[in-house]
Swiss-Prot record:
It is found in: Host nucleus inner membrane. Plays an essential role in virion nuclear egress, the first step of virion release from infected cell. Within the host nucleus, NEC1 interacts with the newly formed capsid through the vertexes and directs it to the inner nuclear membrane by associating with NEC2. Induces the budding of the capsid at the inner nuclear membrane as well as its envelopment into the perinuclear space. GO terms for cellular component: host cell nuclear inner membrane; membrane. The keyword Ribosomal protein does not apply. Residues 1-42 are annotated as: Disordered. Phosphorylated at serine residues in the N-terminus. This phosphorylation regulates the localization within the inner nuclear membrane. It comes from Human herpesvirus 2 (strain HG52). This is Nuclear egress protein 1. It comes from the Viruses.
Length: 305
C-alpha cells in the first residue's frame, strides 16, 4: 500500500519511500529495468566504424536486391555512375599482371598491395605527362637501332657486364643470348620512358623454358605501375608473364616466358658483335656496378614465381 500520511510542504521523501517507488516502477515494467544503450562515444573507434558500415549496408540492401532482379536496370545504373563504387582492390604477392584489366594500376608499399583504377588514381594522373607514346613498332625500331643510342641503355647493359664477371662468361655470348629475347629489351624501354621510376635489371637463367628471366628491381620502399605501363608491357610481350613480388623488403617484377616460344619473325636480328664493340666505348659508373653486385648477391636465393 502507498503511504498516504500527510507531510509538510517542502519536505523531502525519506530513503525508504524512494526505494519503494523505484521498486514499483521496475515491477510495472515487468523486468529489472530498461538497459541504457551505450553511447557512441563510449565505443572504440573500430566498433563505431563497424556499426556505421552495418547501418549503411542495411540501408541500401533493399535497393540493390531489387536491382538484381532486373539486370537491364542494374547495368543502366552502373553505367550512369560517375565515381566507381570500389576504387582499390587488395591483392596478395606474388601477383600476376595477367589478372589485371585495361584500366588497372598496381601499387606496392609497406601499407599493402592493391589494384587501383587508373582514371581515379592520383599517382597515375600525376604521371600521365611523363609517359611517352610507345607502340610495338616503335619498340622494334628502338631494338634494331640500339647501337646508335647505346649510351641510353647503359643501366640495362651494365647488369650484363656484372653478370658476365660473376660467372666468368664471355660478355659477347651472354649478350647474344639476351638479344635473342627482344621482349626483355622492350620491358626496359617501356619502363625507362615511364616516368620518374629508375629501376635496375637482373638477368637469371630460366630453368623451365630456357633463355633468361628478367628481374625488374624497384628502388625505394614503394612502387607504382601506371595502368598504361602495364597495358604496354602485356601488349608488347605476348608469350611472357609478369609477376610482382617482394624479396627482403625490395619489390621486384619478374618477367619470364610462359612457354617455349620461337623467335618472332617480325623482329629483325641484331648483331651481338656490333653491340659488344660499341659497349667497350662506354665507361660504366663504378657506383652502378657496385649496386648491381649487391643486388645479384641479394637475389641469388630468390625463388621466382
Amino acid at each position: 500500500m502507498y503511504d498516504i500520511a500527510p507531510r509538510r510542504s517542502g519536505s523531502r521523501p525519506g530513503p525508504g519511500r524512494d526505494k519503494t517507488r523505484r521498486r514499483s516502477r521496475f515491477s510495472a515494467a515487468g523486468n529489472p529495468g530498461v538497459e541504457r544503450r551505450a553511447s557512441r562515444k563510449s565505443l572504440p573507434s573500430h566498433a563505431r566504424r563497424l556499426e556505421l558500415c552495418l547501418h549503411e549496408r542495411r540501408r541500401y540492401r533493399g535497393f540493390f536486391a531489387a536491382l538484381a532482379q532486373t539486370p537491364s536496370e542494374e547495368i543502366a545504373i552502373v553505367r550512369s555512375l560517375s565515381v566507381p563504387l570500389v576504387k582499390t582492390t587488395p591483392v596478395s604477392l606474388p601477383f600476376s599482371l595477367d589478372q589485371t584489366v585495361a584500366d588497372n594500376c598496381l601499387t606496392l608499399s609497406g601499407m599493402g598491395y592493391y589494384l587501383g583504377i587508373g582514371g581515379c588514381c592520383p599517382a597515375c594522373s600525376a604521371g600521365d605527362g611523363r609517359l611517352a607514346t610507345v607502340s610495338r613498332e616503335a619498340l622494334i625500331l628502338a631494338f634494331v637501332q640500339q647501337i646508335n643510342t647505346i649510351f641510353e641503355h647503359r643501366t640495362f647493359l651494365a647488369s650484363l657486364v656484372v653478370l658476365a664477371d660473376r660467372h666468368s662468361t664471355p660478355l659477347q655470348d651472354l649478350l647474344a643470348d639476351t638479344l635473342g629475347q627482344p621482349e626483355l629489351f622492350f620491358v626496359h624501354t617501356i619502363l625507362r620512358g615511364g616516368g620518374a621510376c629508375d629501376p635496375r635489371f637482373l638477368f637469371y637463367p630460366d630453368p623451365t623454358y630456357g633463355g633468361h628471366m628478367l628481374y625488374v628491381i624497384f628502388p625505394g620502399t614503394s612502387a607504382h605501375l601506371h595502368y598504361r605501363l602495364i597495358d604496354r608491357m602485356l601488349t608488347a610481350c605476348p608469350g611472357y608473364r609478369f609477376a610482382a613480388h617482394v624479396w627482403q623488403s625490395t619489390f621486384v617484377l619478374v618477367v619470364r616466358r610462359n612457354a617455349e616460344k620461337p623467335a618472332d619473325a617480325e623482329i629483325p636480328t641484331v648483331s651481338a658483335a656490333d653491340i659488344y664493340c660499341k659497349m667497350r666505348d662506354i665507361s660504366f659508373d663504378g657506383g652502378l656496378m657496385l649496386e648491381y653486385q649487391r643486388l645479384y648477391a641479394t637475389f641469388d636465393e630468390f625463388p621466382p614465381p
